[in-house]
């Protein structure tokens, strides 16, 4: 499995525990592998983590569950990493509940979708890696802008301080351990006044990073 070398150790350890052989590369090389749908010297069948249709269809079951089990909401807020999660959820949900607004959340250190909506077209932006490693980037992956224009109503860039506050809120009130990308949706929803469903998409965060965020000193 091709992975960014700077990914949280907690995430990499769990992948290895499932028997995978890791091929760590720089963030730039990892991104290029997704653009090229493979990497020279790495053999095997390439499953795209974002733009693979069965993966997106699997994500769509979340949208089906929301429509069936949580009917009283106005907006779904989804973290935007590469776009596969949003595309899947929004495709299913819009088919059943076209009135629901789809809002994506990205870290302001790298929010290519928010920038694309503002500019009216996708382009490369300045990207600063951060502890919110599961979202954010310098550009949209090929094909994702077309999906986003059709399915997304609003794209929000969230300051890291607000993401940290969302991590603390999830820990204190919901007893949920969320990584940065997972807490993005909650951080974006806290700005809103409508009824929101937040997709807290992951809890793979290294313990020292998490402890530094939820400690009383960090919250002061």
What are the roles of these predicted feature ranges?
Residues 1-220:
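PLP-dependent amino-acid enzyme catalytic core
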